[in-house]
């Protein structure tokens, strides 16, 4: 293949996508640690897996190649030294409990096959799994009720956030919250060492070592020349500025970056929870991100006089800013929940705006958001509904659960 990663729009026909099937990490959630691990509730594993399998099969039925993060990660770690390096970094970044010797935990993890190793790291390591030597130190004798040496990673089924495909390259992201920080490490090793990617020198527009956070749920590819990025609870304006400078200096296709400011709260976690593209001239939107007169802060970033300078233009109308950068005379913003104050809040909480376009005018949505789905159909959009009772407990929808790897150009 010429380019193992190629995404130049939000709506081009989806050809290859990366998913993560929910696993043991979901069962390692408990009420005491929900907030720390960024969950509001505990999904029921057998049903969330059934729903995720239905989602994956829905994509396959439309001709999409489905890849799995856990499988690619296991296939990337064929070298013994690479496995050890990966485990060392996971333990360091996961701030594994220092009351057990680092080497003991490392040896335990390395005793598994590659597939089991990845599942164990993702699922977390409980303290009752490892026998430690006789307790001789005070810190060892002190009672500790925290159950994990290595925390589970229940947010991993939202593959959209740790990395994002942009053109023929990608961003490998620094996640804002400590509970998700390790997630992008999997993608770093996959891109560097998996046979599908390693020989292609895939451009990394921004890597996970950059000091300010950015997450894929805030990165939307509007067309070949324009991307939109949310300034949100999870993505920093400084990271957006750095990414824009890197893009403008290292490639010549993307010419504009829209920085769209949204309220910084859990309900509006990323831009794609309140705004997604569903057709050439149609978008879903949660009305609450706009002011009383539809006003909001949008900044158009373009290349400046040199590599470290940007031209920044302020706009206050999302509709007008989109028309300007997309070269459209008209476009439609479809309100989540039909704009009804109750329905829009309820359906946005269950990701009514978080659509996954698999072709122009064809989207995958959660079945529970019936008001928004009906409105999409009334606007000529083909809506493919998927099961959502347990998947939605993680506060992410079909777009959140998928990382496009290859789309056809539009």
UniProtKB/Swiss-Prot annotation:
It holds the Pfam family ADI. It catalyses: L-arginine + H2O = L-citrulline + NH4(+). Its EC number is 3.5.3.6. It comes from the Bacteria. GO terms for molecular function: arginine deiminase activity. Belongs to the arginine deiminase family. This is Arginine deiminase.
